[in-house]
Amino acid sequence: MITNIIISLAVIFVILGAIISAVTAIGIIRLKDIYSRGHAAGKSATLGAIFLLFGTFLYFIATDGYINMQLIFGILFILITGPLSSHLIMRAAYNNKTPYTKDTKIDELKNEFKDKMI
């Protein structure tokens, strides 16, 4: 009984992760500038991958009865490196003066880099 519930939760997490990853891929294709694309890739792709790995983790607990440490390390690795790498890529694009779209109206980093020669 409890095994079926855990497997059902695992399937729900895997399906949600796949849907979030698919929406992320569509967003990366459709968004106009690197800053919007980086936001989509850094936030929602990380969430989709974590849901997929967590669903797999639950499945292994339910079927085999053991905790897979590789999946836990994978979840932690993606949780740390996904948003961090996206942030660094967007910061590098800003330093290279990559243009915004014309819809972007706010530049919050303008004053931070005003005096620095980067």
UniProtKB/Swiss-Prot annotation:
Membrane protein topology class: Multi-pass membrane protein
InterPro entries: PhaG_MnhG_YufB
One Gene Ontology MF term: sodium:proton antiporter activity
Localization annotation: Cell membrane
Keyword ATP-binding attached: no
Record field: transmembrane: 9-29, 47-67, 69-89
Keyword terms of this UniProt record: Antiport, Cell membrane, Hydrogen ion transport, Ion transport, Membrane, Sodium, Sodium transport, Transmembrane, Transmembrane helix, Transport
Database matches in PANTHER family: ANTIPORTER SUBUNIT MNHG2-RELATED
Protein name: Na(+)/H(+) antiporter subunit G1
